[in-house]
């Protein structure tokens, strides 16, 4: 699926869910905002020190599902691999200030987690086996 992620996410509204699993395969899902598009193959999410971030310390794979606010089931799925993260960085707060009012919350670390986009699939269909599609 050939999608310009920057254009896509700027043009649609909807709900995102980020799925992670820990090193033993225990799965978690969490509602997440749209990703920050770094470049054609890289996205980033701002995370608090919670279960999703914890899981990514032992398993660098994640999946992001985005359902558009339209009738039916329209959206995309991103298969992701964690590249790196930054804790309370200037880049994190400059990105965050573009979307959200307010700055750094004292005593609550934030992480800017970068992912390589391995594959993009539609929300429904086309993807029985992510290794073969």
Please annotate each region the language model reported.
Residues 1-133:
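Binding-site signature for planar aromatic cofactors or substrates
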């Amino acid at each position: 699926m050939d999608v310009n992620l920057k254009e896509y996410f700027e043009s649609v509204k909807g709900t995102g869910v980020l799925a992670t699993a820990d090193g033993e395969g225990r799965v978690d899902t969490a509602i997440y905002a749209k990703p920050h598009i770094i470049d054609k193959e890289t996205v980033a999410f701002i995370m608090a020190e919670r279960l999703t971030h914890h899981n990514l310390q032992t398993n660098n794979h994640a999946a992001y599902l985005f359902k558009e606010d339209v009738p039916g089931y329209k959206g995309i799925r991103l298969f992701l691999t964690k590249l790196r993260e930054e804790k309370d960085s200037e880049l994190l707060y400059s990105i965050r200030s573009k979307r959200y009012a307010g700055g750094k919350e004292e005593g609550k670390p934030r992480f800017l987690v970068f992912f390589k986009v391995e594959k993009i699939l539609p929300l429904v269909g086309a993807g029985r086996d992510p290794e073969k599609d």
